[in-house]
Amino acid sequence: MLIGINISPKDFYMSEVHTYRLENESDYFETENLTREAFWDVYKPGCSEHLVVRNMRKATCYIGELSYVCETQSKKIVGAIYCSETIILDEDKRHTVMCVGPIGVLPEYQKKGIGLRLLELSLVRAKELGYACAVLFGNPEYYRKAGFTDAARFGIHIADGSDMDAFMCCTLDADKLLLIKGCNQEDPIFFPDDAELAEYEKLFPPKEKHTLPGQIFA
């Protein structure tokens, strides 16, 4: 479980090859383009995650202290993680927890552990900030490596009260998490407007969309 590894709480962490640090405003367009490259044609033809990132930074739910990037020795940013607060609603009780994602790594740098290290840094810092848990939607096989498990095990469900394997939770404070149950209320930033996306796409080089096997929103 990666959250158990001792990571320095500094604003940056250096490996032999890469530097991990907090995102700066000067990184914004580069990391948005990175996110676009990372998610293009993965879940649907094209993607909208880069617009999610842009809108998240302007939202009240955004947690800038948990947004790390990975850069090479040549200062090229090859990975980035974004986190926000989400509400777990239990009738009239509202519990604020951490929501992970998007996490993006340039295709040519994937499968090198960069995404997991970014996640690790954010989880360690979130624990320091006092969050009870982190939730996300993602590949269960991948995120179990970072200590995530089915959110339903903790009594946490998606907005309509149902469960899905892709909705996962990682414990950061077990005592606090015992007091939390309910349904996740996804922020509207995760559902960008098609017209806004089309206009935003004009800022990037043209890129052909493809319908591919395995796309869940094709």
PLM region spans:
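Acidic/histidine-enriched, glycine/proline-rich intrinsically disordered or flexible terminal extensions
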Residues: 175-218
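Conserved glycine-rich acetyl-CoA-binding loop
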Residues: 76, 106-117, 129, 145
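A conserved beta-turn-beta hairpin within the catalytic core of GNAT-like acetyltransferases
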Residues: 87-100, 110
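A short beta-loop-alpha structural element at the N-terminal edge
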Residues: 18-31
